[in-house]
Amino acid sequence: MNSTTLPDGTLSAGHMIVKSLEAHGVERVFVVPGESFLDTLDGLYDSSISTIVTRHEGGAAYMAEAMGKLTDTPGVAMVTRGPGAANAHVGLHTAWQDSTAMVLFVGLIPFEHREKEAFQEFDPKSWFDTGAKRVMVLDHPERASEIVAEAMFAASSGRPGPVVVGLPEDIITQAHSSVIHPPIPVASGGMTVDDWKDLKAALQKAERPLFVFGGNDWTHSAAEKFSDWLEAHRLPAAAEWRCQGTVSFSSPSYVGPIGYGRPDYTHRVLDESDLLIFVGTVPGDVLTDGFTARQNWDKDNFIVTIDPSLRGRSGPVTRQIIAKPAKFVDDLVRMDLPANDTWAQWTDSLRSIQENWSALPPAEPSAGPAKMATAMANTVRLLSDDAMVTFGAGEHTNWAHRYFPAEKYASLISARNGSMGYSVPSAVAASLEYPGRDVLCIAGDGEFLMNGQEMATAAQYGATPLIIVMDNQEYGTIRTHQELQYPERISGTQLKNPDFALMAQAFGGFGIKVTEDAEVPQAIEQAYQATRSGQFALVHLVVEQRVKAY
């Protein structure tokens, strides 16, 4: 039975899934189509939801994960059966470690064919149970709307994360006659009276306090109020790895990033501070340099997170405040503290170091091969104040991490699980969500080719990111560690690359290859102007192998 032969007044379960996603505010889904969820695809035909057809399930999952960071609604992807689910798994792992709200719908074999090793059969629960918040399989058509509501709630509640929903092919074509389930309210927590008193007392006692912000569970208004409160009290705040922008790059309270690629001073500050207040994050592996920093039990650590389990946390916990960042900030801004010259001096000293560390290199090119520093300097000068940047994993990320001025919450989008192949899909998602904003994508040669095919998606749907591919002919981060542990024994890290500019042109974008530093400013200008005229653009920047940002 298909949707055209159902009794009057009913919808198929597949169509009801779409109606329920609409009711939850979903505006865009990322799909690689499959026969097993054709009825849901048919429901999308008449839907207000935009269907973005991607070229690989990994790209679809990354785009959905990026949407979970860019918006206050879980990102949604749809793939089919075992092969599609396997390819999408990388995006789920990113959502799990990055605490990103995301729902992956997977078309499954017919219900009656289970456990017979049917074509492309797999067991979603055994595959995903350890890396998803919930794994659900639609077992009755009348539960279609209910299961969407449960999935969206599970992805958003507590510590956000990925949810997997299996859609058996024969179940979604059957009639659904019940009502659309409304969104389930998500608890936001908040400071108790004792939380308030203890935090205020700790701040008043501290001489060198530091806020550390992170995670995806903020709102734009909460980020702005948080920045204003910090500035009013002359208090410093540092960013968790790849979470810049929640406190503006130009804020006098912003003192730099912590984690991989961080400046040395922010690592020292973790131990020098007499009070750390983590908001939306915990002192985990990356933030503490492999569980080495801030492990002394005589220091005060306050942790603000809605996750009572404190998953991934290391070191002492003086007090946990169970609250989402936005609710915590609502309470915090009502806390008025007297002026404190010691705080001001502490903050100003850290801010001065940060300004020096992140100051743009010269825009003027020098003699010799193309340089990433020249490219970043010329690019940043062109970008609007609300520009966004996306990147994946590798040596190329260090330039964006250091020099990109993330002025707004969710203006720096990356994979905190260190997943390669993230840069282009996330840039496409960002450009589609914010078509009026500049979107810069920084990719490495190894990382780019893992999902560079999503340039086709950019061309098909009018996304206009500016992509800079840093080509150092190697897997740079791995090579760096290899040289430290096995000096002068190069094995398995070298690359021979195609002409990425010609690839971009073949996909319908603007592409230019640069080998000399003198060519960089004009190439960046041409590429940027191409994005302003409605094309995606790519600059293939061929640099020296052992190039370093710091």
Task: Label every PLM stretch briefly.
Residues 1-8, 178, 197, 201, ...:
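Phosphate/pyrophosphate-binding active-site segments
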Residues 14-17, 24, 32-35, 40-45, ...:
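Active-site diphosphate/adenylate-binding microenvironment
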Residues 15-26, 66-72, 96, 154-159, ...:
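Glycine-rich phosphate/diphosphate-binding loops that line cofactor/substrate pockets in enzymes
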Residues 35-111, 114-120, 272-284, 313, 322, 398-475, ...:
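Thiamine diphosphate
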Residues 69, 215-302, 405-437, 449-453, ...:
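Glycine-rich, anion-gripping cofactor-binding loops and their flanking helix/strand elements
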Residues 106-146, 243-349, 527:
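Glycine-rich, acidic loop regions that bind phosphate or pyrophosphate groups
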Residues 122, 150, 154-205, 358-359:
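Conformationally flexible catalytic loops at phosphate/diphosphate-handling active centers
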